[in-house]
Amino acid sequence: MCKPIGLAVGFVAITWLTQLLFALEVRAEAETDVDVAIQRSVPFLEREGLAWIGKRQCVSCHQVPFMLWGLNAAKNAGFGVDEASLAKHADWSLTWQSWQNPKNASESDEASTAKGNVDTMYFLLLGRSDYESNETKADQKANLRRLIVANQQADGSFKPGGQLPKQRRPLEATTQVATMWALLALPPREDDADRSEARRKALEFLEKELTPASAEWVAARLLLDLQLGDAKAAERTRTLLAAQNEDGGWGWLLNEQSDAFGTGLALYALSQVDKQEHPDAIGRAQRFLTSSQAEDGSWPVPGTKQTAQGKPRETSTYWGTAWAVIGLCETR
C-alpha cells in the first residue's frame, strides 16, 4: 500500500530537483552573459574616455565622470581595469583646472569655472562615493560639495549646465533632475549648516511633483527617496517597474524605445532598493542589455538633445554605455 506513495514522493522530488537545476543553469548562463557584456565594455569605456581627454583636455559632465563611475563599478565587481590610469584620472578630475580647456585657464578662476560645472562636480562625487572611503581625497571632495552649495539658485534648485537645457524634455524636468543629483551628492551632515540649509531649500523646490516623463527623473527621485528614508520609495519603485518595456528595457524617455541609458539607470536604482526583491524585472533588463550590445562593447543610444532627432550620438552612446555597465555591475 505504501509503495505508490513512495514512488509519488520520489517523482515529485526528482521533478523539483530537475526544475531547480534548470533554474540554476539558466541563472548561471544569464550571469555569464552579464559578465561578458561588462568585460567587453571596459575597454570601450577606457579607450573612448581617454580619447575624449586627449582631444578636449577637459572633464565634461557626461564623459569623464561616467568613465570613472563605470570603471569604478567594474573594478569593484571584480573586473580587470587599468587601475593606474583610473587613479591618475580620478585625481586629475578633482581639480577645477581640469573642467575646462587649458586655453581658457588663464582667464578663469575656481568660482567662475565651478558655476558652469555643477553637473560635473556632482557626478564626480557620485561616481566615487560607492567605491571608496570617506577619507579618500576628503579635502578635495569637501571642496566640491562646498562649490555645489555655493552655486544653488535662489529658488533652491541647481541649474543644469552645458547642453542639458537642450534635452528633449521640459526644462523644468531637467532642472528637477539636476537638483536631485545634487542632493544625492550632498548627503545629510548635521555639522554642516550651509549644506543643511541648501538641502532644505532644494527639497522645498522639489515639492512640486511632475508627471514622470523620463526614466532618469523616476530613478533619481527613487534614489533621493531612499536617501531620505521616505515611504514614497515603494510607490516610486512601482512606477519604475510599471514603465518597463516588453523587451525588458527602459527608454531614457518613458514613451520611447528601450535604450542602455534608461535601462542602466533603472537597474542602478533597483539595485539600491534591493536587487533580491525584483529578480524578474532585473533579469529581463539584463537580457535586454546583453542582447543589444554592439561588438565594440558599446550600446548605441539616441541623443538626448532636440537637435539629435532621435539618432545615436557619440556622447549619448558613451553616457548610456557607462550607465549600462554601472547597472549591470550593481545587479549581477
State the predicted function of each range.
Residues 1-9:
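N-terminal secretory signal peptides that target proteins for export/translocation
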Residues 22-332:
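Preference for long, amphipathic alpha-helical scaffolds in soluble/luminal domains
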Residues 8-20:
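Bacterial N-terminal signal peptides
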